[in-house]
Amino acid sequence: MTDHDQNPDGRSMSLSELLALSDEELRACLEPLIDNMLSGSADRDHARHVQDFTTRLKVIVTQENLAAQCEDYQKRLGTFARREFVALFRRRASIAMTWRLFFTKSEDEFVLEAMFVERQGRIQIEHCMIF
C-alpha cells in the first residue's frame, strides 16, 4: 500500500471510491504510480519500476526484460523528459489514462497509456505501453 492510493484517514481506497473522485483528484492518486514506473525504468531499478504492477504484469516484466527494454530505448531515445496528460477514461472495473510522452534524445511525441485496477486491496497498474 502506498500513500497515493489511500484516503486521508490512511486506509486504502477501492476502485469504486477512486471512480467517485474528480478528474484532478483521480490524477493526483494515480500519477505517482506512473512516476514510480518511469523513474524505475530510467534508473534501471526493477523493484521500483514494478512496485505498483499487478502480479500478472510483474510476471511479464522480469529484471531481464526490463534491462533489455532500457538498453534499447535509452540508446535510441534517451530517458523520459516530460509527459503531458491527455485523457482519463472511467470504466466499471478499471481506469485508463493517456499522456503525451517526450524523451531527451528525440523530438518525436510518444503515447503513454496505462490501465489501473484494484487487486489485493490496492490500486495497481494492470497494463502499460509506450508507442
Predicted regions: what they are:
Residues E31-P32, A47-A87:
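Short solvent-exposed beta->alpha transition segments
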Residues H46-A47, R122:
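Internal amphipathic alpha-helical segments of the cytochrome P450 catalytic fold
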Residues M1-D43:
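Short, low-complexity N-terminal intrinsically disordered segments enriched in polar/charged residues
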Residues A68-E118, R122, H127-F131:
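Surface-exposed, charged secondary-structure patches
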